[in-house]
Curated annotation (Swiss-Prot):
Role description: K(+)/H(+) antiporter that extrudes potassium in exchange for external protons and maintains the internal concentration of potassium under toxic levels.
GO biological process: cell volume homeostasis
Name of the protein in question: K(+)/H(+) antiporter NhaP2
Domain RCK C-terminal: 402-484
Record's keyword terms, sorted: Antiport, Cell inner membrane, Cell membrane, Ion transport, Membrane, Potassium, Potassium transport, Transmembrane, Transmembrane helix, Transport
Membrane topology: Multi-pass membrane protein
Entry's Gene Ontology molecular function annotations: flavin adenine dinucleotide binding; potassium:proton antiporter activity
Transmembrane segments: 6-26, 34-54, 57-77, 86-106, 108-128, 162-182, 193-213, 217-237, 240-260, 269-289, 292-312, 334-354, 362-382
Subcellular location: Cell inner membrane
Family from the record: Belongs to the monovalent cation:proton antiporter 1 (CPA1) transporter (TC 2.A.36) family. NhaP2 subfamily.
SUPFAM superfamilies referenced in this protein's UniProt entry, alphabetically: FAD-binding/transporter-associated domain-like, TrkA C-terminal domain-like
GO cellular component: plasma membrane
Amino acid sequence: MDASTINSLFLIGALLVGASILVSSLSSRLGIPILVIILAVGMLAGVDGGGIIFNNYPTAYLVGNLALAVILLDGGLRTRVASFRVALWPALSLATVGVMITTALTGLIAAWLFNLSLIQGLLIGAIVGSTDAAAVFSLLGGKGLNERVSATLEIESGSNDPMAVFLTVTLIDMIASGETGLHWSLLGHLLREFGIGTLLGLGGGWLMLQLVNRINLAGGLYPILVVAGGLVMFSLTNALHGSGFLAVYLCGLVLGNKPIRSRHGILHMLDGMAWLAQIGMFLVLGLLVTPHDLLPIALPALGLALWMILVARPLSVVAALLPFKAFHGREKGFISWVGLRGAVPIILAVFPLMAGLPDAQLFFNLAFFIVLVSLLVQGTSLPWVAKLLKVTVPPDPAPISRSALEVHITSEWEMFVYRLGAEKWCIGAALRELKMPEGTRIAALFRGEQLLHPSGSTVLEVGDMLCVIGHEHNLPALGKLFSQAPQRGLDLRFFGDFVLEGDAELGAVAALYGLKLDGLDAKMPLAQFIRQKVGGAPVVGDQVEWHGTIWTVATMDGNKIQKVGVRFPEGTRPGPGLFL
């Protein structure tokens, strides 16, 4: 490869990445997932468009694995362990039982539609059987889903790859060797994948945490060290026949949930690297496909994709979530719809090509077609379906920016910047009149371009920008004081006519609103009653019905229900409320 060729590669690569970023601005306007747009850029530049011929499957496999490792590391860093209280076991059930059921149901129809053997059909089912972390993390961000739904989908997408990889590799080996039967030893291989991945992921995350917090480096080197450590865990786990995808996700999870040096610098750089990984991966996968090869299989492939979306995924979700009573029908319906396929199925479809199996090109084209349909149909409709099934909650008010104050190695102090909107009650109030959360301080106040020195007598005006020092747990209280109201089309009465304290006694609540206890303990706290009715770990937005009234979990403090909203039937006149 001479210098001119290398220069051309740099030029083409930079132009494609730049074009993907610029065209991605159409995503929100057209309601099309950004991943579809990037995939389309790759296809348009490929053999049937710009004429770039790319058919190097090992390179695509390399790029895909590297990109997914970075994306999963970033996803783990941003996942809160607190969300595991409501989603860990349901997500693991979906990642194992759900994938197996989806594989079986999809495989049966694939074998029939394309006149393949049963084991070849099951291989297609295994290739497209797992949801994709890149697609889920990208498309669910900012949708305002309740914690039970969002955490379940994110943990599922981060942990279901081992099952899909295991089934794919096993079925490829069986086809290559001419075997037709399954053996119990396969269960041991699966447990080994999960076990080694979990052990090395958690252990590697802990070692990386100690390393980052004990050495002094230039600020920009910590994110690079974290990425390098994540890739070491990914490759080492794969070398030991464990799940590298699971390991790198858990490594990020450990790092993201412990005090760590340069946290915001790490998260900021990983965000950019995750975006670059997604763009590069979907561009390469778009270049890899030959669009005119998809036309002959379009009709049966569309039928298979719709079968998987409308039948296989919903049935697998219902079966996998059967033991978990906290999930109501609307949540199961939404989880069924968000069976997003992305890069993982396309990368898994490269395995048969590299193994030289018959009909391997058909498997690849089918996987690509199903991913395209999934992103277009499911990804495009996510906001509408979430609103229809009522699985969203009003978002917490947020500062316009936040940055870390590295007072010491594991400092958790941050600076939050708020712009005061006209709708905030604090406009016209003096600073001394504000009920600031304990432990927070106003560090600076900007009015226009002028920096003011805030004092107790300073009166707040519309457009003022406040810099507040505090901790992450202060954000809800600060948000009520200073944040701009989010522009969302959610019902302003989402939580009800009144909001009550969770520790209010059931007897007092019943007497206040004229409700019958029907044998319930009058001393029982309202929060405990709601928890029992939910049937599992509650989340903000959970609703239960009691004597025609709707009770909604309004705020949580860890595992504890802090406040509950109550809504009365239309046309009724409620008694006095326990206003907050």
